[in-house]
Amino acid sequence: MALPWYRVHTVVLNDPGRLIAVHLMHTALVSGWAGSMALYELAVFDPSDPILDPMWRQGMFVIPFMTRLGVTKSWGGWSITGETITNAGLWSYEGVAATHIILSGLLFLAAIWHWVYWDLELFRDERTGKPSLDLPKIFGIHLFLSGVLCFGFGAFHVTGLFGPGIWVSDPYGLTGNVQPVIPAWGAEGFDPFNPGGIASHHIAAGILGIIAGLFHLSVRPPQRLYKGLRMGNIETVLSSSIAAVFWAAFVVAGTMWYGSAATPVELFGPTRYQWDQGYFQQEIERRIRTSLDEGLSLSEAWSKIPEKLAFYDYIGNNPAKGGLFRAGAMDNGDGIAVGWLGHAVFKDKEGNELFVRRMPTFFETFPVVLLDKDGVVRADVPFRRAESKYSIEQVGVSVEFYGGELNGVSFSDPATVKKYARRAQLGEIFEFDRATLKSDGVFRSSPRGWFTFGHANFALLFFFGHIWHGSRTLFRDVFSGIDPDLESQVEFGLFQKLGDPTTRKQAV
């Protein structure tokens, strides 16, 4: 009878050679997917407008990860920052994709070799002649090598000592570029938005990993601990590895969703909390106040606001606005942003400035309400016109634009004022091209949302996997009904007297 599908991995349980083969093949698939996905994204990516149509609006998933590690140029002659490039070198987007695909091919061949030549002397215990692995020693080797890699990344790549550095930006995602990072060794290194912490933590964790690896290579575990934690069982390795992976997945889901120096706004889009807290709106207001204090007019002050900053202050870029099961990039939802119309200022007929109440994240529709500076409702778009007291028509609301494409233009006809009041609910007002991609007008999430959703789900799945395999290996004797140390004693015909090791029969 064949193995059921959920037990097929038992074929590599006591077969170290083929255990290596399947891991090589898995790594080949991961590397091959990464390279292929990068080439696909590069084929559909439009780099022409990094301000209003950045990578995260186009639904790019692997390009942002390459960019944050220092890859910014393409063999196609463009750069992520907008410049024209003549010589991108090997480590361009296409170069990184190609090296992943080449690595995938080499790993594929290595997997086949190890599957065919599975029975190596290296995997056999000299004393018993049976297949066995010195798992504590292998753990030490892996810990040492990963420590070297971790230290090297922090000390050389991130710092620019031998490498490009990483993507570093200001708190508002306006000035991002790749640059070397100085390690932060003080308390400031624990600030999740400080890129210096990335360098220092990799250096520190790498040194710790190297020391721990050398310790496990030179010191054998006590026999009681070895048996208690089932260190001789490969399923123990599986369980603890799953634990490491699910913990990492939970951590990166958090750093992605809440934001950090490792997940910059320019590469992954804003977080939902930046909309909820009016983060970009407050920065825009601060800049306007500063400009007005310098003697500039309101029109001049708004004209100084970067279009990039205004675009962040738009609800359509909030990753929590797109439903998890709405497939496609943000551009497939509200469309490709074409231009900022300017900041809309509403006034009633008495000259009082009115502010449109913004839509909260988890609303699809929201009443259009205009308040004065004291928070008192002065105008609205009523549901029942017969009972209205504050309608746009009754209050005599007008709108004037400052900055952007409609700078200095004003409207007073109620239909137009209502149109812009509805759009002002969504933050700064932009013009969108919905024809090119046949965009349906329904908001989509950004790669920040997809990454978080995927990693949180897999982390939960792997958490249960850790519990499952940990229980199996710790309580194997209970589940099987036989103490693993008594297997030979209950084997029929091995002893003249069952279970008496002093009466072992000799092989003829």
Swiss-Prot record:
Principal subcellular localization: plastid
Protein name per Swiss-Prot or TrEMBL: Photosystem II CP47 reaction center protein
Role played: One of the components of the core complex of photosystem II (PSII). It binds chlorophyll and helps catalyze the primary light-induced photochemical processes of PSII. PSII is a light-driven water:plastoquinone oxidoreductase, using light energy to abstract electrons from H(2)O, generating O(2) and a proton gradient subsequently used for ATP formation.
Compartments where located: Plastid, Chloroplast thylakoid membrane
Gene symbol of the encoding locus: psbB
Lineage, opening ranks: Eukaryota, Viridiplantae, Streptophyta, Zygnematophyceae, Zygnematophycidae
Manner of cofactor binding, per the entry note: Binds multiple chlorophylls. PSII binds additional chlorophylls, carotenoids and specific lipids.
InterPro entries hit by this protein: PS_antenna-like, PS_II_antenna-like_sf, PSII_PsbB
Gene3D superfamilies associated with the record: Photosystem II CP47 reaction center protein (3.10.680.10)
